[in-house]
């Protein structure tokens, strides 16, 4: 990892500020710039975070405008409007499209060589919009995708099986949203297919249990929002993990939102799929062997995203 790494975060809300906190704790940057339309909010977050500088690796955290982001290695976009009660998904997309039309050109102007990491929702749609607005190669425009959803899936499986979450391997793929799919056919524990492990461990693993776990994963954000108003800690850790893979050139396989160009029979859509992530962004997309039901569900997820995109482009 290079010594002097600069990261800029656009958006000083819950997700943006939590992301900066996670990046600081991970020692992943020597400079972090926070930009927000509310300059006082950005300045306040930078001050608060900077006051903890004595407890982490050397890092300068400051607020600024787009000019101050110049020379960033990675620009993380967390800004955007939140969905209001009664507001349709399409209305939210159009609102955020207009916001991104003001953000992305400014980011590109000062950071022509940066990797753009989109976190704002709906993340797959906004990552595609960022790709189109930026003119960057697809490898350098990435969405947080289903990295968090995959972590939620592994966690819930670990709770059921009473196994360390790090020893459970599986993916959530597709849209970061209601049409996402769980790859049960690929789920393995201790090198065993999940069904084999169920038999070996005498744990319940029937269709109803699988559906409940999948449903809990899919609706996890709604449950958290109902309890505390917003989700931000776990997504910040997911973003930190993606940034880590990029800066350390790990070639890690993460379900980031990547541009599909024929993989899985899907074209011209950004969605969460297993991708090799390294110093230059997305190095490659891995086509994992899904069963027929999973393939069909992934295709349906892509159609859902495509319909939203067709309303804009």
UniProtKB/Swiss-Prot annotation:
Which reaction is this enzyme known to catalyze? (S)-lactate + NAD(+) = pyruvate + NADH + H(+)
Coiled-coil regions, chain positions = none
Report the InterPro entries cross-referenced here: L-lactate/malate_DH, L-lactate_DH, L-lactate_DH_AS, Lactate/malate_DH_C, Lactate/malate_DH_N, Lactate_DH/Glyco_Ohase_4_C, NAD(P)-bd_dom_sf
Q: How is its activity regulated?
A: Allosterically activated by fructose 1,6-bisphosphate (FBP).
Q: Which domain of life is it from?
A: Bacteria
Keyword annotations from UniProtKB, A to Z:
Allosteric enzyme, Cytoplasm, NAD, Oxidoreductase, Phosphoprotein
* CC terms in the record's Gene Ontology section: cytoplasm
Residues the entry annotates as binding NAD(+): 15, 36, 41, 66, 80-81, 102, 119-121, 144
Predominantly, its location class is cytoplasm
Q: What is the similarity comment for this entry?
A: Belongs to the LDH/MDH superfamily. LDH family.
Self-association or partners: how does it assemble?
Answer: Homotetramer.
Q: What name does this protein carry?
A: L-lactate dehydrogenase 1
């Amino acid at each position: 990892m290079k010594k002097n790494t600069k990261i800029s975060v656009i958006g000083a809300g819950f997700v943006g500020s939590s992301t900066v906190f996670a990046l600081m704790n991970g020692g992943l940057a020597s400079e972090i710039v926070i930009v927000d339309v509310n300059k006082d909010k950005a300045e306040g977050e930078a001050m608060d975070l900077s006051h903890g500088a004595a407890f982490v690796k050397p890092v300068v955290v400051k607020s600024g405008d787009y000019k101050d982001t110049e020379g960033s290695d990675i620009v993380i976009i967390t800004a955007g409007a939140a969905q209001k009660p009664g507001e349709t998904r399409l209305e939210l997309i159009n609102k955020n499209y207009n916001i991104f039309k003001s953000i992305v050109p400014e980011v590109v102007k000062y950071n022509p060589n940066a990797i753009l990491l989109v976190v704002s929702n709906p993340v797959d749609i906004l990552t595609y919009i960022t790709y189109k607005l930026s003119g960057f190669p697809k490898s350098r425009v990435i969405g947080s995708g289903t990295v968090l959803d995959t972590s939620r899936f592994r966690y819930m499986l670990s709770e059921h099986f009473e196994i360390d979450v790090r020893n459970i391997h599986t993916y959530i793929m597709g849209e970061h949203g209601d049409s996402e799919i769980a790859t049960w056919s690929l789920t393995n524990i201790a090198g065993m297919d999940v069904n084999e492990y169920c038999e070996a461990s005498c744990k319940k693993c029937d269709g109803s249990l699988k559906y409940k776990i999948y449903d809990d994963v899919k609706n996890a954000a709604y449950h958290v929002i109902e309890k505390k108003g917003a989700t931000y800690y776990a997504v910040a850790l997911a973003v930190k993990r993606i940034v880590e893979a990029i800066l350390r050139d790990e070639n890690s396989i993460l379900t980031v939102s990547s541009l599909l160009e024929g993989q899985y029979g899907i074209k011209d859509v950004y969605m969460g799929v297993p991708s090799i992530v390294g110093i230059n962004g997305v190095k490659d997309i891995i086509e994992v062997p899904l069963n027929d039901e999973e393939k069909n569900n992934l295709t349906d997820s892509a159609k859902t995203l495509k319909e939203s995109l067709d309303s804009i482009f």
